[in-house]
Swiss-Prot record:
Location of the protein in the cell: Membrane
The organism of origin for this protein: Rattus norvegicus (Rat)
GO biological process: endocytosis; immune response; NK T cell activation; positive regulation of gene expression
Pfam families: Lectin_C
Protein name as catalogued: C-type lectin domain family 4 member F
Amino acid sequence: MKEAELNRDVAKFCTDNQCVILQPQGLGPKSAAPMAPRTLRHVQAIVALVVVTVFFSLLALFVVVLQPWRQKQNEDHPVKAGLHGGNYSGSDNCSQFVRRAEMQEAIQSLRASGNSSSCHKEIQTLKYQMDNVSSQVQLLGGHLEEANADIQQAKDVLKGTGALASETQALRSSLEVASADIHSLRGDLEKANAMTSQTQGLLKSSTDNTSAELHVLGRGLEEAQSEIQALRGSLQSSNDLGSRTQNFLQHSMDNISAEIQAMRDGMQRAGEEMTSLKKDLETLTAQIQNANGHLEQTDTQIQGLKAQLKSTSSLNSQIEVVNGKLKDSSRELQTLRRDLSDVSALKSNVQMLQSNLQKAKAEVQSLKTGLEATKTLAAKIQGQQSDLEALQKAVAAHTQGQKTQNQVLQLIMQDWKYFNGKFYYFSRDKKSWHEAENFCVSQGAHLASVTSQEEQAFLVQITNAVDHWIGLTDQGTEGNWRWVDGTPFDYVQSRRFWRKGQPDNWRHGNGEREDCVHLQRMWNDMACGTAYNWVCKKSTDWSVARTDQS
C-alpha cells in the first residue's frame, strides 16, 4: 500500500498502478447531501407563487364584481351615495342592514323604472362575470390542491432527507470502522512482508548452504533434462532414451545404495570403536584415579620425607628415589592425557560421520524426488508419444484419404465411371483380350468381373450392345472358367448371363478355340485374339495385384 487518504465521507487507497475509492452508496459529492436544501427551496417557491396567485385573483374578483355595481348605484341613487359618503357612526350590523335595505330599494326602483331591459342586460352581465369568477375560484382551488400536494411531497422528501442523513451517519461510522480495519490489515500486511523477507533470507541461506552439496545431483538432473528434451525433440527414439534414463537412474540408485551400505558399515565400525574407546576411557579414568591416589600418597610421603630431611640428611637417597617415581607418574599422566585427546578426536570423527550420513540421507531423498519427477515426466512423454502416434495415424489417414480423393478425381477425369464401390473404364478403341488385360493391369486394374445382376445391368447399359471384353477365361483348362482378377466364379449365378447355347468353344478356321468372354448384352465365348472394346475394373482399395497370364 503506497498511499492512503481518509476523509469524513470518502476513503482513498492508492498503490503503484491503481487507486480505490470507498464512499457510502448514494453519497457522492453531487448526490443526496444538497438534495434537501434544493427541494426545500423548490417548495418555498411553489408556496409563494400559489399565495401571490390567490391574492391577485381575489383582488381581481373584488374589482370586477363591485366596480359596475358602485357606478350604477352612484348614477341612479345619489341620495343613497350621499348617505354612504356621509358621517354614519352606527354599528357594523346596522350598516349591513341599511345596505341590504338600500339594495332592495334599488332593485325595486330598477324594476319600476322604464329601463328594465337595460337592467336585465346588466344583471346578465353580472351573472356572467360571477360565473367567470366562480370558474377562476375553482381553478384557484385546483392550484391550491396541487400546491398542497406539492407541499406534502416536499414534506415526504424532507422526511426522506432525514432518513438519508441518518443513513449517512451510519455509513460514516461503518466507514470509520472499515478504516480502522484497513489500518489493522495494513499493519498485518507489513508484518507479513517482514516475515516473508525473513523467510526469503532463510530460504536463500539454506539454498546457498545446500547448493554445493546438490551440485553433482544437479548435473545429473541436467543431463536427465537434456535427455528428456532430446526425447521431446524426436519421439521416435523416446523408448530407447527412456530405457537409458531408467538404467542411468537405476545405476545411480545402486551406487547410492552401495554408498549408504558402506556408510552403515562405517557407522557400525565407528560404533564398535566408540565402545572400545569408552572402555579404554573408563580404564584410563580408573588409572588416572589410581595415579591421583598414588600422587596423594607420594605427596604424603614427600611431606614425611621432607620432615625427615629436616631431621636427618640420610634420607636424600630415598628422596631421589621418590623423585624418580614422581617423574614416572608424571610421564604416565602425560600418556593418559594424550590418550584422552585421541578419544576427543575419535568423538569428532564420529560426529563428522553422522553429519555425512545425514547429508547422504538428504541426497538420497532428493534423488528419490528427482526419480519420481523423472518417472512422472516419462509417463507424460509416453502419453505424448501415444497422442503423437494417434495424430500421426490421423494425419496418415487424412493423407491417404486426400490421396484417394485425388486418385478418384484423376480417374473421373480419365473417363472412369463409379458404380457400387468400384471404378470401370470403357475403352473407345479395340484390342485383343490379352492386350486389353495388359492395359488394365498398367492402370492398376483388371478386365471386369461380374458378380451380381446389378453389375451386369450396369455394364449392359454403358456398353449399349457393343462388344466389350470382360475378364472371364478358361485358358489352360477347358471348361474351368475363372475371373482374371481372382474373384471366385459362380457357375450357378452366371448361367443367366450367357447367351443361349453358350459357351460352345467353337473352333475357328485358324484352329483357335474360344477361350475368352465378351459382353454384348449377354455373355459369349470368343477367340482371345479378336479385337474388341474392353471394360477395366478397379477396386477402391488401390491394391489390385497382377495375375500371371498363361
